[in-house]
Amino acid sequence: MDNNFIFGIIAFTALVLVLAVIILFAKSKLVDSGDITISINDDPEKGITLPAGGKLLGALASKGIFVSSACGGGGSCGQCKVQVNSGGGEILPTELSHISKKEAKEGWRLACQVNVKSSMDVELPEEIFGVKKWECTVISNDNKATFIKELKLQIPEGEEVPFRAGGYIQIEAEPHTVNYKDFDIPKEYHEDWDKFNLWRYVSKVDEHIIRAYSMASYPEEKGIIMLNVRIATPPPRQPDAPPGQMSSYIWSLKAGDKVTISGPFGEFFAKETDNEMVFIGGGAGMAPMRSHIFDQLKRLKSKRKMSFWYGARSKREMFYVEDFDQLQAENDNFKWHVALSDPLPEDNWDGYTGFIHNVLYENYLKNHEAPEDCEYYMCGPPVMNAAVIGMLKSLGVEDENILLDDFGG
């Protein structure tokens, strides 16, 4: 046999072996393998052991530790902040829009962005260990306005979600396809759906998703969770954009369907003071407003002065009217007001008109003796929130008295 041929075979074999060694070495460094340990809060009883791989958010969830993530782990909401003292690697560019330089130095990271490659040491808020997961049953899912449904869920018998007014839960959904033409919507709300042909949309989701929703129910409403969910249709200027994944899924739910939720989460809680409370809401931002106001007046029997200012387009978009009318009749310390931005002729509306921040200012705060001493609780569309905050700042209201829930709008 030709010596050159034999030499060639030997050289080729040697090259393959060298490459194999390099690949195995690289794999040992770059590919997650084996079990790792995550030490939590320096408490041996809280530590977990699991295979390396995936993200910290998912690793914790696999062991029943649920960190809040309104965007479902996409890195866009910034809620899943945890302190990683060691083992988390370098902070990623995707995290820097939510984590300041000071926080980064202190070890703060987004759990949804931290790769689980080696053992690590993390710190989690103690309240996270009270978060649980439940499979609930849909009681009802009814339209309260043209683009808002009230989803009412039954908690499993013998269980309860120990939430505070202003809190929220997360809903999960498996891959699915939703056809808008199958939505059950009363005829009184068809006008806009027909006008913009919203029936044509289809939401196709190929992955497990999670989203957060503020609760409209309050703690005394035992055994149920109630949400106000606005359908996220594509904006008029982008009619071909995909509709909202989770809102489409929720709108497709019917009585008897099973839904997985986790919680409770939250920080949009009422301060324990005697200061006047001013609630400002719009759209699906009604949810935490209802929860707070019902809790203050029905459960706590609060005597604090409070008012609720709600903005809607037309009378058709108003809901829970009888509930708030009754609360107003039963409580001398509570008043509520609605402003319609675009009332219809058939509304025969003689109440406030215009945007809610202007109505609140012109009809109440402008002549208030000390608006800076009130506490302002708000939830609504981003444009409304920005307008209200700007107005309050012009009145000298400090940040500590402006409480905002970003979910409900």
Curated annotation (Swiss-Prot):
Q: What is the lineage of its organism?
A: Bacteria, Pseudomonadati, Pseudomonadota, Gammaproteobacteria, Pasteurellales
Identification of the protein by name? Na(+)-translocating NADH-quinone reductase subunit F
Q: Which GO terms describe its biological process?
A: sodium ion transport
- HAMAP family found in the cross-reference section: NqrF
Q: Which cofactor does it need?
A: [2Fe-2S] cluster; FAD
Cellular component GO terms, alphabetical: plasma membrane
The EC number(s) attached to this protein equal 7.2.1.1
Boundaries of every 2Fe-2S ferredoxin-type domain copy? 34-128
Query: Which GO molecular function annotation, any one, does this entry have?
Result: 2 iron, 2 sulfur cluster binding
**Pfam families found in the cross-reference section:** FAD_binding_6, Fer2, NAD_binding_1
